[in-house]
Amino acid sequence: VHGELRQTWAQTYARCRRLASSLQRAGIAKNDTVAVMLPNTPPMVEAHFGVPMAGAVLNALNTRLDPETIAFMLDHGEAKAVIVDPEFATVIAKALTLRQSKAPLLLIDVEDEVYGAAELRVGQQTYEEFLAAGDPQFAWELPGDEWDAIALNYTSGTTGNPKGVVYHHRGATINAISNVLEWDM
């Protein structure tokens, strides 16, 4: 549920598979970092599943950070792609000018009807255009090793630049099982 959008879990799964497929078609490979600067919207949920389905590592950027810190994280995490909501396009646009790396980035704009029309676009294409090229039946594979990275998060950087913290599939699985047990699901 997001604004007027109603989507089943089957539809969400197909969209996650499309995202994974599209990322791989765009050259995103195992252990590549895909950064996202999104609020709690369907594309954020899809990224949490679709990015690992592509074998890539999700870097969910803190939406309250300044462009300088975002630029550092994009460089340090060696992001290969960035998916951005229009709400944060100005911050991302500025961060892109501050990057030290000259490596090209795949930039994808989410069109968020709840937020409104984008005043600024930073991407080469929209998220829906990107997904449309993907395969809803994409045959994704489980990680080959439970210690493979699933996410890259950053500390607050109170003693300098933020520090990258890598999460692995094993930790994500154990955390999910712990939640089921703790919440008596």
Per-segment meaning from a language model:
Residues 25-26, 53-132:
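Structural core segment of the AMP-binding/adenylate-forming
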Residues 32, 56, 147-148:
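Surface-exposed loop/turn positions
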Residues 50-54, 180:
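Conserved short alpha-helical elements in the N-terminal third of ANL/AMP-binding
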